[in-house]
Amino acid sequence: MIVKICGLKKAVDVQAAVENGADMIGFVFAKSKRQVTIEQAHELAKNIPTNIKKVGVFVNPTEEELTAAIKGVPLDIVQLHGQEPTSQAERTDAEVIKAFPVKEGKLPDNISDYKNAYILLDAPAEEYEGGSGKTFDWDKINSDVLLKNKLIIAGGLNAENVQEAIHRFEPYGVDISSGVETNGEKDPEKIEIFIKTAKGVE
């Protein structure tokens, strides 16, 4: 099971993710309380082994913003959380995760247009895209129409519910941010417990 820890801002949190077996580490460049600059992400990325993929999270970025981050950090994957056209995803010089908010149990009509991207299902956004700490309605989703080897589940995951999510969706990976925080800050102990719990599912 691929595990992505998202919204990291401190070296100690990156270290906790690395030491406990995270497969992807996410840096948020979109406006949010977890936002980092390219320079900050570059410094944090120095402590990430090459076998762990570095992901940049964006909302409706320009081509220039994407290119600057991909080269400056550098990034292996870009995660697009806005209304980005498929053409932008196809032109990007990195792998792509396209995030879709699941509203009222419905998958977006254009989800199949992103043929080469990983598909991330998340709860509907509130103040900003992602990191809301809320789950979408798992019972209403027919994940059979999605490619399991491209599917990533996010939205309100934590150590208590991640095993159920994995059994239900059989995804390629799971993505967490607020579920490994205490009082709005990343918690190394929660990072450790979540990764071990997610990877312990048979």
Swiss-Prot record:
Protein EC: 5.3.1.24
GO molecular function terms listed in the Swiss-Prot or TrEMBL record: phosphoribosylanthranilate isomerase activity
InterPro entries: Aldolase_TIM (IPR013785), PRAI_dom (IPR001240), RibuloseP-bd_barrel (IPR011060), TrpF_fam (IPR044643)
Keywords carried by this UniProt record: Amino-acid biosynthesis, Aromatic amino acid biosynthesis, Isomerase, Tryptophan biosynthesis
BP-aspect Gene Ontology terms: L-tryptophan biosynthetic process
Catalytic activity: N-(5-phospho-beta-D-ribosyl)anthranilate = 1-(2-carboxyphenylamino)-1-deoxy-D-ribulose 5-phosphate
Pfam families for the chain: PRAI
Associated pathway: Amino-acid biosynthesis; L-tryptophan biosynthesis; L-tryptophan from chorismate: step 3/5
Isomerase listed as a keyword: yes
Family the entry assigns: Belongs to the TrpF family.
PANTHER family: N-(5'-PHOSPHORIBOSYL)ANTHRANILATE ISOMERASE
Protein name (database record): N-(5'-phosphoribosyl)anthranilate isomerase
Gene assigned in the entry: trpF
